[in-house]
């Protein structure tokens, strides 16, 4: 059984259900959204839930279900994840109808490009936890996604796609939003932005990680 910090707030039977029935589905996804990714989101969600006094079972379930919609089209995966929550009657063992509604909405609200603030503290927790903003992890994930989805591109093509994605999502005018004040992600996002503003340095990082991922 995978142990996270702050696990004391999660029911053991819920944990067993998630680890045997839900998490294995992430093995079918790309490297940027695999089992390691969802485990990281769970760990960060539980830490934030404890800090904010939120329910551990709720935060755990939301994190576990948040990307299941990647079994369908990526562009609407957050909405598909919400439908998966709503249709999974097994959740009634641990949660009331109202709690399941909140779980569904939080899963729908987790996406970085969402134009509105998450509707509950749980949506803010999973949205924040989904942002693993360690700079090297962000850069590596972006390269991995490009290699997986655009295998026809050469290194220069991947660099141009990488740079465009950095500008659109992570730059000072990018669409990423942080919903929890003074979270650990704020400092990490600033480090990413500093590198975006220094393209020659960013290219060195890209070339190193690209070489590692294509070795």
What are these regions (language model features)?
Residues 19-28:
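Small/polar-rich, solvent-exposed N-terminal microdomains that initiate assembly or binding
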Residues 11-19, 42, 58, 82-86, ...:
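An amphipathic alpha-helix signature
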Residues 41, 45, 76-91:
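An active-site-proximal "capping" alpha-helix that borders the catalytic cofactor pocket
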Residues 55-73, 77, 81, 102-111:
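His-Asp-centered metal-binding catalytic motifs of divalent-metal-dependent phosphohydrolases/nucleases
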Residues 83-119:
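Hydrophobic, well-structured mid-protein blocks that either form specific transmembrane helices
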Residues 35, 39-42, 60, 97-108:
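Short, well-structured alpha-helical segments
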Residues 2, 6-9, 27-52, 65, ...:
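Divalent metal-dependent phosphate-bond-processing catalytic cores, especially two-metal-ion Mg2+/Mn2+ enzymes
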Residues 47-54, 70, 74, 90-91:
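Short helix-loop boundary/capping segments at the starts of domains
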């Amino acid at each position: 059984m995978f142990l996270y910090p702050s696990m004391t707030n999660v029911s053991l039977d819920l944990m067993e259900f998630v680890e045997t029935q839900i998490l294995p589905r992430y093995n079918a996804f790309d490297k940027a959204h695999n089992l390691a990714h969802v485990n990281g989101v769970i760990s960060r969600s539980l830490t934030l839930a404890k800090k904010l006094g939120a329910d551990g079972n709720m935060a755990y379930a939301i994190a576990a279900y948040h990307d299941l919609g990647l079994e369908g089209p990526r562009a609407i995966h957050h909405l598909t994840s919400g439908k998966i929550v709503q249709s999974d009657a097994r959740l009634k063992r641990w949660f009331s109808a109202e709690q399941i509604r909140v779980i569904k909405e939080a899963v729908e609200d987790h996406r970085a490009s969402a134009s509105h603030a998450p509707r509950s503290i749980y949506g803010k927790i999973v949205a924040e936890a989904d942002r693993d903003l360690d700079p090297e992890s962000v850069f590596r994930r972006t390269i991995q996604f490009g290699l997986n989805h655009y295998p026809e591109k050469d290194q220069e093509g991947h660099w141009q796609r990488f740079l465009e994605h950095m500008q659109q999502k992570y730059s000072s005018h990018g669409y990423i939003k942080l919903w929890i004040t003074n979270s650990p992600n704020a400092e990490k996002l600033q480090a990413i932005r500093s590198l975006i503003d220094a393209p020659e340095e960013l290219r060195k990082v890209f070339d190193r990680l690209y070489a590692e991922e294509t070795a």
